[in-house]
Amino acid sequence: MKRFAIFAMMTTAFALSALAQRDETAAARVPLENYLKGHATGDGEYMKKAFHTEGNMIFVRDGKYETRSFAQYIAGMSGKPAADEAQRKRWIEKVEIVGNAGVGTIILDYPQGKFVDYMTLLKIGDEWKIVNKSFHFEPKQKPNQ
């Protein structure tokens, strides 16, 4: 009977831990979903919900390391969907979290090319935020090339 009680307690603890992790993963997806909505609509308010105010984009362009603040990125948004929005696809590929830190991978598949975004996530207080973003862009060849 003692073994059964120990087994039952361990099983319950494992199940509760798994449920808590699933809830936390769902919460960590919220800023990623806001990021996707920002791209779909061109509305910087979604990006403000997604990004931490002190975060940065980090990337390589023409072989050079570059950074851009999230504030600069948001300021460049048009406020309306892109003209080719109907041809654009975007999704959350993966989210991994441990404790209050995580990483999200997002795919932006656009007519001109494919972006792979790697988002560093932190839980600050009760809210998850994207604190840094790095990305790779792969241009698509035009049909005549």
Predicted regions and their residues:
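N-terminal, post-signal-peptide region of Sec/Tat-exported proteins
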Residues: 43-81
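Short, low-complexity N-terminal intrinsically disordered segments enriched in polar/charged residues
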Residues: 16-37, 41-45, 49, 142-143
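Short beta-strand edge/turn micro-motifs at domain boundaries
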Residues: 114-141
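Positively charged n-region of N-terminal signal peptides that target proteins for export
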Residues: 1-4
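Hydrophobic pocket/interface hotspot
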Residues: 35, 47, 55, 104, ...
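Surface-exposed, charged secondary-structure patches
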Residues: 21-27, 60, 70-114
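Bacterial N-terminal signal peptides
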Residues: 7-15
